[in-house]
Amino acid sequence: MIPVVALVGRPNVGKSTLFNRLTRTRDALVADYPGLTRDRKYGRAHLSGYEFIVVDTGGIDGTEEGIETKMAEQSLAAIEEADVVLFMTDARAGLTAADLAIAQHLRSRDKITFVVANKVDGIDADSACGEFWQLGLGEVYQMAAAQGRGVTGLVEYALAPFAEAMGLVRDDDGEVVTDERNYTEEEAEAEQQRLAEQPIKLAIIGKPNVGKSTLTNRILGEERVVVYDQPGTTRDSVYIPMERDGRNYVLIDTAGVRRRARVHEVIEKFSVIKTLKAVEDSNVVLLVIDAHEGIAEQDLGLLGFVLNSGRALVLAVNKWDGLDQDVKDRVKTELDRRLGFIDFARIHFISALHGTGVGHLFESIEEAYDSATRRVSTSMLTRIMQMAQDDHQPPMVNGRRVKLKYAHVGGYNPPIVVVHGNQVSRLPDSYKRYMMNYYRRALKVVGTPIQLRFHEGDNPFEGRKEKLTLSQERRRKRMMSHIKSKKA
């Protein structure tokens, strides 16, 4: 599982500052795909070995009319669906009526909540934070998000209860060990075999009303009962086991919860958090796009999260039937222009309602999964690395050329290639993209992003005092005695 952390508080207390600090470590991945913008409200964070979804719920006024009347519906949903709430306050401004109103709402939700007094830099923090105990939510944690003070400690403390469920390992000091796998040939084969034997987890995602539920019903070959909001309805996606052409799947239905707007109309209740959690839990993502509306900003936001998560990807442009040919040509041109950065993903033009093209989706889904989990040897990865280096030499750094030594598998789904060498931390992004594309072409990878990690080659003798071996000492003694005899 991957926990969800919601940032809650009135306007201008530093929620966006903390959000940017937590999520910026993932920006480099999105930056590898020009034309893709990162969502400013939902992000994937990685800190001290913990991976989590962070949500900026936006400012809450909390006026006397009642907290719920002034809180946006999406902010309420984020609090409901979060595993941890960081309730942010302004230590400089002190306790306000809005803070008290927000605290009252949070107490009624019975959520794991941490009160954060932000902007403690340059003031007497202990004195300033004392009044926030009145919120009745327990200990007050001091932070200066702009400078990064207190951020790591709070995240580690808040997410510690989830470490075991996240599969994290602790060392003897209780610290979380960051898992960057260094597979041996045997371990890589065992991991690949495990992935090959388990069902393919397929998440069908997309913005509201693009036809996800229709596509789900078409794939399953049956009309599923529409689930309406009722007290106690699960917030999680529905997991549906299925078999197709002798292969097992688990279909993750993110469109399982609906709300009825009018008596005869059903409108999907869209939950970004539920969708993001489904992406994290999947092997392959099927992103559904409405052909009538083209590429929307919400599509790009979901696409960015899929790429950051490293999941295999297939695109389905739905409602294709009935469009005039000139409209189809215009849609294809827009797709080429706006989605050129994911040229590795297959695009299908379908009609979920009539079943046109739906059967071919699974050919691409299997192809993408097989690419994401294909076994590749260290010798092959090193050979491809050497070919890329021969075709285009790495740049010079301080008069010395960056030297790539060897490469090996670092993980699957997504495929991770770990490259070792000298001064690799100074490689420009352009050369890293060149290497990534070279590996993609050489391995004929389709439907999945490839991640490259670069590790500096450690000098095993660095920091050691020179110490001669026994044979070297004997040789040195013979040489010294020979020199002395010649002088005599």
Curated annotation (Swiss-Prot):
EngA-type G domain span: 3-166, 200-373
Binding residues for GTP 2: 206-213, 253-257, 318-321
SMART domains: AAA
GO MF, one example: GTP binding
Binding site for GTP 1: 9-16, 56-60, 118-121
Record bears the keyword Manganese: no
Pfam family, one: MMR_HSR1
Keywords attached to this entry: GTP-binding, Nucleotide-binding, Repeat, Ribosome biogenesis
Domain annotation KH-like: ranges: 374-458
HAMAP family, A to Z: GTPase_Der (MF_00195)
NCBIfam families documented for this protein: GTPase_EngA (TIGR03594), small_GTP (TIGR00231)
Function in brief: GTPase that plays an essential role in the late steps of ribosome biogenesis.
PANTHER family per the UniProt record, alphabetical: GTPASE DER (PTHR43834:SF6)
Protein name: GTPase Der
UniProt organism field: Shewanella amazonensis (strain ATCC BAA-1098 / SB2B)
